[in-house]
Design a protein with these regions (language model features):
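A residue-level signal for conserved active-site and pocket-lining positions in enzyme catalytic cores
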Residues: 77-78, 168, 251
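Coil-to-beta-strand transition motifs
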Residues: 159-163, 170-172, 218, 230-232
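Short histidine-centered catalytic/ligand-binding loop motif
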Residues: 64-66, 110-117, 186-198, 240-242
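Hydrophobic/aromatic-lined pockets within catalytic cores
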Residues: 81-85, 155, 179-182, 212-216, ...
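Conserved catalytic cores of phosphodiester-cleaving nucleases, focusing on short active-site segments
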Residues: 164-193, 207
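Metal-dependent nuclease catalytic regions and adjoining charged, substrate-binding loops involved
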Residues: 9-12, 17-21, 194-201, 206-293
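Secondary-structure boundary elements
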Residues: 137-143, 170-176, 211-219
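Metal-dependent nuclease catalytic cores that hydrolyze phosphodiester bonds in DNA/RNA
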Residues: 3-164, 272
Length: 293
């Protein structure tokens, strides 16, 4: 059975900091001004952008970020696996994008901010979700809890309002679902590299902090990584403590940058940077001093 948990409010509107069950995905993603102190909330995804390029963050905040079609399949699997629904999804009555009618329907839906999927994608996503649900670890994790819990809190140090959208919240864990596009990429080592590249440990730090602030309960963080390629292997994992601590430090730095830039109103790039060229570039072309042993 699934049931709401302590500190989670059943509501379709946000009125104050807390954890909410029932907020539509489009409302959460709208980033609308929802009244003090909840105006312009910061999220994990926003933190990633502001750490790398504050000006890009400022632009994306005022403009709809272009969608990536490779994410559409992930959103579909996510909705089917968690049985949560997603009001952004728009199913086109076709099994591919080859016909002009299907392409026009897709483009029209995307212009409206929808995620367009065809019936072939729906069939494939259902197979992925079914394979994941057959894994006993996934079955156990999803045996209790709620999908799509929206969490809002105010950071005490900076005064910045923060938000997170929890894929699945159960009594012991904050659970995140990741779809992996290639065969074997959900295995521990390759997934670990992806986790570092996409700042997943920061996500773990942000989500667990937000849930604790909103509900008063400290939970762990677990990730369900499922491969889109057959046979859809599943990897259930936790990030090491040191990585989550590093992610927390990155989150704190992002909040500080946000608070400073928001106060000054200065989002433009400053100065001239040095391109971080990988150390392996030109290694065989440059003479290096011999080291005496």
């Amino acid at each position: 059975p699934v049931r709401p948990h302590v500190g989670v409010v059943m509501s379709q509107s946000i009125t104050a900091p807390g954890a909410y069950d029932g907020i539509p995905e489009t409302e959460y993603q709208s980033d609308a001004l929802i009244g003090p102190p909840l105006a312009r909330p910061m999220s994990y995804s926003s933190a990633k952008t502001i750490l790398s390029h504050p000006a890009r963050f400022a632009w994306e905040r005022e403009n709809r970020r272009p969608g990536k079609r490779e994410f559409d399949m992930g959103s579909l699997v996510h909705a089917l696996l968690l049985r949560s629904g997603d009001d952004r999804l728009h199913v086109v009555d076709a099994y591919n994008w080859r016909t002009k009618a299907a392409q026009e329907s897709r483009d029209e839906a995307q212009e409206q901010g929808k995620i367009a999927v065809h019936r072939g994608m729906l069939r494939d996503a259902a197979r992925v979700a079914a394979a994941a649900r057959r894994d006993p670890r996934v079955t156990q994790i999803l045996s209790d809890g709620r999908p799509e819990v929206s969490v809002y809190w105010v950071d005490e140090e900076t005064g910045v309002t923060c938000r997170a959208r929890i894929d699945w919240l159960n009594p012991t864990d904050v659970v995140d679902v990741k779809t992996v596009g290639s065969y074997s990429k959900a295995d521990p080592k390759p997934f670990g590299r992806s986790a570092a590249s996409f700042d997943y440990p920061m996500q773990a730090a942000v989500y667990t902090e937000g849930v604790e602030r909103a509900t008063g309960v400290r939970r762990g963080f677990a990730t369900i990584a499922v491969e889109l390629d057959p046979p859809h292997f599943v990897h259930v994992t936790r990030y090491p403590e040191w990585a989550v601590l590093a992610g927390e430090a990155r989150w704190r730095r992002a909040l500080a940058i946000y608070a400073e830039r928001e106060k000054s109103g200065q989002w433009a790039d400053e100065g001239i940077t040095t391109t971080p060229v990988p150390e392996w570039y030109g290694y065989d072309e440059i003479d290096t001093p011999e080291i005496e042993v």
